[in-house]
A protein has these predicted regions:
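A generic structural motif
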Residues: 11-13, 89-91, 96, 123-125
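Glycine-rich phosphate-binding loops of NTPases
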Residues: 61-65, 69-70, 96-153, 167-174
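Short, solvent-exposed loop/turn segments at secondary-structure junctions
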Residues: 163-165
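A general secondary-structure signal for short beta-strands and their flanking turns/coil
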Residues: 2-3, 17-19, 81-85, 96, ...
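A generic secondary-structure signal marking the coil-to-beta-strand transition
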Residues: 31, 82, 151-153
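Conserved P-loop NTP-binding catalytic core
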Residues: 33-36, 47-111
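A short hydrophobic beta-strand->loop->alpha-helix junction that borders the nucleotide-binding pocket
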Residues: 157-161
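Pre-Walker A-like glycine/lysine-rich segment at the N-terminus of P-loop NTPase domains
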Residues: 2-52, 175
Length: 176
């Protein structure tokens, strides 16, 4: 699995209001990025952003279907629209991919609701530097080629889960 995450960009994702960008280490000798912080400051939300961007899934205890920043949603007026967006730039087998998942939220009669289905786009840079979009029918295949969902738990985990990775057999099963 030859994958290197370059950047994570979040727009209004849960407690991250506005644009938040994280640049990850791409140094071949120092390619591990550790995110430290106090409890409730967003480390787990960063992991959830990866899962949502790649697979459209989150695992939040409170309001798991509502990803828009709460403060921003409280300020919305009738007819206004806001977006939640997560974009990941990743190098996979020498090709740079940009994966972007977007959810629009509308305020109608004082209620803020997300549109029924988030959109996902995947593009990649060709050797000549031009960006090409992946066909919608191939998006899931491309994402699973970059990082199969079954393996994602071994790449994106918080320290509380380290002890739950019980054996190499678990990893071997996920790889199969």
């Amino acid at each position: 699995l030859d994958m290197l995450i370059k950047t994570l960009r979040m727009e209004n994702f849960r407690q991250f209001r506005g644009t938040t960008k994280v640049d990850f280490s791409c140094d071949p000798d120092k390619n591990v990025t550790i995110i430290l912080g106090d409890n409730t400051f967003g480390k787990t939300t960063l992991l959830q952003a990866f899962n949502w961007c790649f697979y459209g899934k989150v695992n939040f205890d409170q309001r798991p279907d509502f990803l828009l920043n709460y403060e921003l949603s409280e300020e919305m007026r009738n007819g206004e629209q806001q977006i939640v967006e997560v974009e990941i730039t990743v190098l996979h087998d020498g090709t740079e991919y940009i994966i972007t998942r977007t959810q629009r939220y509308n305020c109608t009669n004082g209620n803020v609701r997300g549109e029924s289905v988030p959109t996902i786009k995947v593009s990649y840079k060709q050797e000549d530097g031009q960006t090409e979009s992946v066909k919608a029918t191939q998006v899931d295949n491309v994402i699973n080629n970059i990082l199969p969902e079954d393996l994602s738990t071994y790449f994106f985990f918080d320290t509380e889960r380290v002890s739950s990775i019980s054996s190499r057999r678990d990893v071997a099963e996920a790889v199969k």
